[in-house]
């Protein structure tokens, strides 16, 4: 029975992740481009008044292109297909990634329920942290290839590397260690997962006791139940992303080809000194636009499949 439950969570997690990845891929590409240090900054001139002789001083400056500007640039120079760059390795990675995550989450929750107060916040955070650690450690090479493909800029019509070619290039130029660039930043991002699932499980428990849940048994869930879970997942991910977003920027910088960014704290220091603290939130808007519906789709699909395929409780 335990093995069957694990397989169910593996399957449900893989399906949820696949659906979410396909539907939100263009926003993933936009977010990665905005996070990158290779983003072209638009030059501006700042006028500073109040000098000793009363004259103004014109200082050169720069403005980070917005979401729509980056989207327009990609469509004009690279074509609409570039909005799906990295989808191949993303699909190859997201199904096993989500499958591993949800299977590890459900199993670790069983274990932690026997150690701490059952279904408490500590249990949810510990389970989410453990599952994220396992998933990040196993899947980082695939996410590394996906990020490199999304950062590759080629004019419309120019041949671009596929996932296998990109993986070979990374291995040839950087060796096996190259596939694990950004892993420390991914570990730092475990805090985001812990916050997200703490909020989600809390809201899920509240919804189970509220008017959104049908008054019948757990096996008679209606559309309103899953709609409520989608809103809970969206809210949880939005809060967690805003709190822990800087690690995403650091991770993208660490995965850039031939970059000056070598280690987590060295990268954080360089970004802060050279670009200011606002740079840690570059790409936040497309991240929220992508991650909120993506998480809502993934979790609600996962919950739906588990509900449909799980054996009725006696």
UniProtKB/Swiss-Prot annotation:
Keywords attached to this entry? Membrane, Mitochondrion, Mitochondrion inner membrane, Repeat, Transmembrane, Transmembrane helix, Transport
Pfam families, A to Z: Mito_carr
The subcellular location is:
Mitochondrion inner membrane
What GO terms in the biological process aspect are recorded for it? mitochondrial genome maintenance; pyrimidine nucleotide import into mitochondrion
* Family annotation (InterPro entries): Mit_carrier (IPR002067), Mitochondrial_sb/sol_carrier (IPR018108), Mt_carrier_dom_sf (IPR023395), SLC25A33/36-like (IPR049562)
One GO cellular component term noted in the UniProt record for this chain: mitochondrion
Q: What is its main location?
A: mitochondrion
SUPFAM superfamilies reported for this sequence: Mitochondrial carrier (SSF103506)
Superkingdom in the source lineage: Eukaryota
* Membrane-topology annotation of the record: Multi-pass membrane protein
Bilayer-spanning residue ranges: 7-27, 44-58, 114-134, 183-203, 226-246, 291-311
User: GO molecular function of the protein, one example?
Assistant: pyrimidine nucleotide transmembrane transporter activity
Q: Which residue ranges contain the repeat Solcar?
A: 4-111, 119-206, 224-308
Q: What does this protein do?
A: Mitochondrial transporter that imports/exports pyrimidine nucleotides into and from mitochondria which participates in dendritic cell endocytosis.
What protein family does this chain belong to? Belongs to the mitochondrial carrier (TC 2.A.29) family.
Q: This protein is called what?
A: Solute carrier family 25 member 33
Q: From the UniProt record, report the name of the gene that encodes this protein.
A: slc25a33
């Amino acid at each position: 029975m335990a093995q069957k439950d694990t397989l169910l969570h593996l399957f449900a997690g893989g399906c949820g992740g696949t659906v979410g990845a396909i539907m939100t891929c263009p926003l993933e590409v936009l977010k990665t481009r905005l996070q990158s240090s290779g983003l072209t900054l638009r030059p501006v001139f700042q006028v500073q008044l109040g000098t000793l002789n009363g004259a103004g001083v014109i200082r050169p400056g720069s403005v980070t292109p917005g979401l729509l500007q980056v989207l327009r640039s990609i469509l004009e120079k690279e074509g609409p297909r570039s909005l799906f760059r990295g989808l191949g390795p993303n699909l190859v990675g997201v199904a096993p990634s989500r499958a591993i995550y949800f299977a590890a989450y459900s199993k670790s929750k069983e274990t932690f329920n026997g150690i701490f107060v059952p279904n408490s916040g500590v249990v949810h955070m510990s389970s989410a942290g453990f599952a994220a650690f396992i998933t990040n450690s196993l899947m980082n090479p695939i996410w590394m290839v996906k990020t490199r493909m999304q950062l590759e800029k080629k004019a419309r019509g120019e041949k671009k590397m596929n996932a296998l070619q990109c993986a070979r290039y990374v291995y040839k130029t950087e060796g096996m260690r190259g596939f694990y660039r950004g892993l420390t930043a991914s570990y730092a991002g475990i805090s985001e997962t812990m916050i997200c699932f703490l909020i989600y499980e809390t809201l899920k428990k509240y919804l189970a006791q509220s008017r959104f849940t049908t008054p019948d048994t757990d096996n008679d869930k209606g559309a309103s139940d899953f709609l409520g879970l989608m809103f809970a997942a969206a809210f949880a991910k939005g809060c967690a992303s805003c709190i822990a977003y800087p690690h995403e920027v650091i991770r993208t910088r660490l995965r850039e080809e031939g970059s000056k960014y070598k280690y987590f704290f060295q990268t954080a220091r360089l970004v802060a000194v050279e670009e200011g603290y606002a740079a840690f939130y570059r790409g936040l808007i497309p991240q929220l636009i992508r991650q909120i519906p993506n998480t809502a789709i993934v979790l609600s699909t996962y919950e739906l499949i588990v509900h449909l395929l799980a054996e009725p409780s006696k």
